[in-house]
Regions:
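Soluble FAD-dependent oxygen oxidases
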Residues: 2-499
């Protein structure tokens, strides 16, 4: 069977997945005659009730309005400091639902957001007064172990991918937190514990099905709609809503050595210096993230390495020995573990269920100036946890030329992230201000940023961040989204006036 035919059969089989039934609106008089909303340019409009009802009837999934019982839960994202209220939430069950949403949004020029795993720290997976296209019901996977391919629907979480492939002795790069949405991670880049072996998640993308701004469902790969396929690999959600991903899989032992090594904080600068020197020459099977953390409630500051070694197990001791020699070990919980278990190990610790603020940038060298800035300015606080950590890059990620995909940052050896989190419901302003001050001191050591972590960058910064790929991305935007319907992202603004 040809790959394209298998892709189509996978779409059919995944579309047949059943979902829980839902109760429609109890009574017509619970819906206002007109629904207040906003356009992409933030202009207020009113949508006729009859149009909303027709839209609702066209969907296989649910359409939620603010008065509906499930609306308050459906509007939430993982960063609890984001408190937005869409005018409509469409919970899509298939590609046809997504097409209906895009056509409806295009007709009314609605502000449009797309949500998968709700991990967008900047809140771009939701909106105030617009249409939220919620892909969370659109979950399913189909594996072709012979061809080493997996087909993943647009609302799926990374854990579904790992669960389907690892028992078959196959794997691919899929982040570090299992409840991350596959869409946002893939379209922006896709770092992960296997990235140094297999490349970014987007480097393993072989094809997509995508609903573009004209409501058309298009197939794109290296041969068909090849420019669109190039653009979605790093251009984020600028060109449409991906409803199906096809990924390359690789042979992989589902057993790895992973966990955490915690060191004495008195050696934190030496440990970061070690990381800067050792990580760039470490085997590609070794991935480790150094974390410096100032916990809330007066607990001592911490420094630790989160580790994953996915190479031959009989070589693990030799490969990991330098990490044990890097500093005074206070706690060691490295063990031979199922990779799937390791992928889920940080789910409960992930701060994205609290209020938070993150900033990030790419690093080529871990200099003494950077180390001093990170450590000396990390501030303890009674209610705020603050941290800085490195996502290790290099290896297969950096072997790809900068213009092979739209993701240009192949020079980076690490993605540095700083951030803070605090309890939901407390005043966010002082915590955000501290986070911004901390980042301003760190930013001068970075070069470019990961668009998945983009928070408040200016349009000029976003444009510049695509480096030599920007002009090509603008041409693709002009072709597939000339009205900038998909603007809640690291936005590539079209340069033509749509007819």
């Amino acid at each position: 069977m040809k790959r394209r035919e298998f892709f189509k059969s996978a779409v059919v089989s995944l579309a047949a997945v059943s979902y829980p039934s839902w109760k429609g609106y109890a009574d017509d008089n619970t819906i206002p005659i007109e629904i207040p909303a906003v356009t992409g340019s933030r202009q207020p409009i009113a949508i006729e009730r009859i149009a909303v009802e027709e839209f609702r009837k066209s969907l296989n999934g649910r359409l939620l309005l603010p008065e509906d019982d499930d609306y308050q839960v459906a509007r939430l994202v993982r960063n609890r400091s984001i408190d937005k209220r869409p005018a409509l939430i469409a919970q899509c069950r298939n590609s046809e639902d997504v097409q209906a949403c895009v056509n409806f949004a295009h007709h009314y020029q609605l502000l449009t957001a797309v949500k998968c795993g709700a991990h967008s720290v900047s809140g771009k997976g939701t909106c105030d007064g617009g249409l939220l296209i919620d892909l969370s019901p659109l979950q399913g996977v189909s594996v072709n172990p012979t061809k080493r391919r997996i087909f993943v629907t647009g609302g799926s979480l990374l854990g579904r991918l790992d669960e389907a492939t690892l028992p078959l002795g196959l794997g691919t790069t899929a982040g570090t937190v299992s409840h991350t949405g596959v869409g946002g991670l893939t379209l922006g880049g896709g770092f992960g514990r296997l990235g140094r072996r297999f490349g970014l998640t987007l480097d393993n993308l072989k094809s997509v099905e995508i609903v573009t701004a004209d409501g058309q469902l298009r197939y794109a790969d290296a041969e068909e709609n090849s420019e669109l396929f190039w653009g979605v690999r790093g251009g984020g959600g600028n060109f449409g809503v991906v409803t199906m991903f096809e990924f390359q899989l690789h042979p992989m032992n589902p057993k790895v050595v992973g966990g955490r090594i915690t060191y004495s904080f008195s050696q934190v600068k030496d440990l970061l210096r070690f990381y800067g020197e050792h990580s760039v020459k470490a085997p590609v099977e070794l991935y480790y993230d150094p974390v410096i953390f100032a916990p809330p409630m007066g607990f001592d500051k911490m420094v630790y390495f989160d580790v994953c070694y996915s190479g031959p197990l009989d070589q693990a001791e030799k490969v990991l020995k330098p990490l044990y020699s890097a500093g005074k070990v206070l706690k060691d919980n490295l063990e031979t573990i199922d990779y799937m278990t390791l992928q889920k190990s940080g789910d409960d610790d992930d701060p994205r269920g609290a209020s938070q603020y993150l900033k990030g940038g790419f690093i080529t060298d871990v200099t003494s100036g950077l180390i001093d800035t990170l450590v000396d300015n990390l501030e303890a606080h009674p209610t705020r946890g603050s941290m800085a950590f490195f996502q290790q890059s290099g290896g297969a990620i950096n072997e790809v030329p900068a213009d092979t995909t739209a993701f240009p940052h192949r020079y980076a050896n690490s993605n540095l992230i700083t951030g803070s989190f605090w309890p939901y419901g407390v005043d966010t302003a002082p915590h955000i201000e501290w986070s911004r001050r901390y980042w301003r001191k760190v930013d001068k050591f970075t070069k470019g940023f990961y668009t998945v972590d983009e928070f408040s960058e200016s349009q000029q910064q976003v444009n510049k961040n695509f480096l030599g790929n920007y002009d090509r991305l603008v041409k693709i935007k002009n072709q597939y989204d000339p009205t900038n319907l998909f603007r809640l992202n690291a936005n590539i603004k079209p340069t033509i006036t749509a007819g």
